[in-house]
């Protein structure tokens, strides 16, 4: 026990009996109501030694003042006297009556109700077994209490007493029971200022406790609890009226039933019989102080650390400030740190450093009591500079970073289970510290980027970085021991301040290779990360994380970007040797823009020298997927296509020597195996690409093979007759020739518009187009030297051979495509001996086509004439419109005079400057 409060006189031997007290905190004034209806005001003296009487209002009321309540913001003093609730003007020396509630009488008690959702003043009044709700507002031009509908259940058996409000909760007693009522504004109603529907509230009543004594309800706002007197025990609930799971955790037992209690953190002060006052701690309920004041019977809370006590004609103040320093020192010595901290926090007598020192001692005491969570929660309230953090971590010297372990500290020898709990609490504490420091560092970085940083900011940032380095390194070790699943998340943090060497050493010593890889990745140690993957991929006992090493390396390389191209090429060589397809994915990923933005020429040169087999799939992706237009890549792909086809063709000819004889020519792409596949791809590329040199490719292809390829290239050169001769005479494939014509026909091109006529000529006069334009020399072809076992007669196209005309097919072509062929020219090409019956079908088709074309032209002419006539009509109408422009004519856009400027006229007759009209039209388009 110790003397928490020192009693001092406020007023002694008053001529009236004191019935109630109220404290006005704004001017430190105590208001005392008397049985004779007088009101006394005592204000703290100028020298702050005692109180002095500053006002007496003998006309305050005619009868005893039973209850007082100060409403500072509204400048009201609420009072119950003679069963009526009245509102007096607080700032008036005579305390003039502002209003009174006539409707409710007699008033048993009342309480101020201040919902969080509203700034208005409400009062809840108890009278005749009911509760009433009134709102302070304006009515008929003056302020008064307006009744608000309050709907609640059940009906009370007696009049409620001892009402207290906390937020939207109302606590009260009826007979020997305590109740709570949850207040909720009726959403179907409005306040009078918002509409015609009157405001209303609903109350939901719940029974809490029963008791057999004088009721007492005390809100403990800072602890978010409410205390209820229940005989000699004071029990508490939360602010919603719910009891804690541990019923005994917040119960305070007085030596006898208190008649009245007040809460003055960290104490509960109870008024007992015979003027005895008992003070108990709210932390453990222990008795702190007992004092006796003659005939004391009324308590009232004052400023923090003050309680007023009234007897019949005497008033005292119980003050904690006089013995505060001595009491705090005593509590620290007795290890009652919670009380010491609360007293220091409530007072301005202690500097901030002193408060932090008390908290530090309290936290260490909790740690020694193995209350680790509470200990580190308190450490979290302490200013966390590097020295403070180190002093905490010294309790775990094995966690200190290198360079700090020489600092000595007392190591608690505790069981493994307790040490694990301590490490868990330490981890939570360090996590909060690192989050706070990272935010401050980010703030300093923003100051630097904006140019607003000062020299002191730079020093402060350096301290924060050092603290964060210690915290992160310790937290890494702590997580490894307690929460291994969080190690990787900690390493991935962008603000992680662990030095690379410290983190690497820690992870290697623990064998956490997966986490080590993440460290390499986040710190951009790319070579170390890739070397780790390659090394682990060959180990049978490696972590499952490294099982799919090739794919992991591919994804890693894909994320590096063009700035790391030499590194990508270095490790791509290893991937290509292991898996060609995976190696190509390094350079062709569509997941990010990294691969797309690589230097493509450098990649091509690398693949040429290191892995030519990967070049074709890479270039196909670049050209077809990424639509690369550069001729360099197109010609390189063609070069490798031709080289691959040449190699495959050599093997194919040796295996199937008769496949390319004059009697049995295998069509391009129909060959078995890779040759057919690559020839199809080559043909498609020759057809769709426009970024290569046809002459260069033509020289790479032998004249005795690759006929389809040569035909497509000749078409690109507009040498259609030679190309069609290949399809018709060599390949005997008229449908392919017809498809060729469809591909190249263009009615607006002088040469390409004649392609169908050229096909007709080739069919009618096949011997006029010989393949003599490109001489053939066996030793100059890409594969001429390796065909010694194949007869030249079976592969060469004989330049002197004769082809038979195919008039019937030509006539069919003419009939099918009569609209694309010069009919007269085609008919003139037919041999004179051609029977008329053969030509009839073609002539009939020509006539029908000509008729359709004539009808189409006639219809087009009619439509054009109709449109022209309408245009002329509109033109004539516009020209006949009279436009009057005078000196008063204004522009509808800028509202200036038209004068002699160029102008436009709108359909409704309005005028505008031409440039204003153009500007407005341009703005609308934008």
Curated annotation (Swiss-Prot):
Upper lineage ranks?
Eukaryota, Metazoa, Ecdysozoa, Nematoda, Chromadorea
List the GO cellular component terms: cytoplasm; HOPS complex; late endosome membrane; lysosomal membrane; membrane
Q: Which residues cross the membrane?
A: none
Q: How does it assemble?
A: Probable core component of the homotypic fusion and vacuole protein sorting (HOPS) complex consisting of the core class C Vps proteins vps-11, vps-16, vps-18, and which further associates with vps-33.1, vps-39 and vps-41. May interact with lgg-2. Interacts with cuti-1.
Q: Which InterPro entries match?
A: CNH_dom (IPR001180), Vam6/VPS39/TRAP1 (IPR032914), VPS39/TGF_beta_rcpt-assoc_1 (IPR019452), VPS39/TGFA1_Znf (IPR019453), WD40/YVTN_repeat-like_dom_sf (IPR015943), WD40_repeat_dom_sf (IPR036322)
Query: What topology does the record note for this protein and the membrane?
Result: Peripheral membrane protein
Q: What is this protein called?
A: Vacuolar protein sorting-associated protein 39 homolog
Q: Which residues form the CNH domain?
A: 15-306
Please give a single GO biological process term from the UniProt record: autophagy
Q: Which domain of life is it from?
A: Eukaryota
Q: What happens when the gene is disrupted?
A: In 1-cell to 20-cell stage embryos, there is defective autophagosome degradation with an accumulation of endosomes, lgg-1- and lgg-2-positive autophagosomes, amphisomes and paternal mitochondria close to the nuclei. Reduced number of gut granules in the adult intestine. RNAi-mediated knockdown results in a reduced number of gut granules in embryonic intestinal cells. RNAi-mediated knockdown results in the formation of large late endosomes/lysosomes, but with simultaneous expression of rab-5- and rab-7-positive vesicles on the basal side of gut cells.
